[in-house]
């Protein structure tokens, strides 16, 4: 499925809907399951739009993909503008933080609307609004964990690179590996199998990244 939000291309893979349905498998009512999938879709789109809009402010052309692991926003430089790889720490941190904080702002708007008296008596709508609030807060907090490839991990890497360009990536991946293992072990103790899978996957990805860094030449600082 492909469409545009304004000028931002959005592509949704079929695996995204499978992932959302699996996460909502405890919903026995088909209508409530569809509602849950819609909530996940809206929440992750809001998150990725946060990245996309801030990237656009910095002269990048964003595109959004929703897939079996959530969402990704990719950037190409606009004509005559620098690529993201040449950005300094502050811009990279702002782009990374924009996703979680877009979700927090959306959840805050929902809460503000309720305080203002904008309510509904429809039970299904109330459930959807409650889930939208919870998912946007929860997804934002999860993404702020200092673990690559999450947003918090990208913030950490931008900072460690600023502190040590030569060793920044290695430090970021080591911290990410420790956090991923911790998440997997904690989730295992609580039989939270999806979180076990995510922790294991992210641990594997960071181990692979560390192995590649061992064989790679020292990184060159981008020219700005």
Task: Tell where the protein language model's regions lie, with residue ranges.
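Hydrophobic transmembrane alpha-helices and their immediate loop junctions
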Residues: 1-224
